[in-house]
Amino acid sequence: MEIICRSVFRDLEAGANEGNEACALAREKFCYEVAKYVGAYAAALNGIDVLTFTAGVGENDVNVRAAVCEYLSFMGVKIDPELNGNRGKEMVISTPDSKVQVWIVPTNEELMIAQDTADLVKAAK
């Protein structure tokens, strides 16, 4: 199986949506790994109250959020498919009966990098 996707996640998503099996497998593996780590942290913390999707993929990729939450359904995670269709808007996307609140929280990664860089430059003087 040949992977014909670049490293940019939206290209991977587009490939998966166009039927590229390798891209679909890579996306599924990504979602599985995210859910695995959330599950591990939930076990270590004796449960979670909130699951937050943020940054480029988390705040914009409807399919990733749906797949990750489906993997976590054993914990009572339930999302509203209509609300999950939103991108880049701060909001709760879980259903009222979900045992875990699921949020989308936008971030400005470039601004954070610029602020951290400015702090490092100041500290180096």
Residue map of PLM features:
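Adenine-nucleotide phosphate-binding core of ATP-dependent small-molecule kinases
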Residues: 2-5, 9-44
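Glycine-rich phosphate-binding/hydrolytic loop that grips phosphoryl groups
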Residues: 80, 84-124
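A glycine-rich helix N-cap at a beta->alpha junction
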Residues: 71-77
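Short, glycine-/Ser/Thr-/acidic-enriched flexible segments
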Residues: 8, 58-59, 109, 119
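Alpha-helical scaffold segments in soluble metabolic enzymes
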Residues: 11, 40, 67, 116-119
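Active-site proximal loops enriched in glycine and acidic residues that flank catalytic Cys/His/Asp
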Residues: 16, 27, 52-57, 106, ...
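Glycine-rich phosphate-binding loops at beta-strand->alpha-helix junctions
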Residues: 49-71
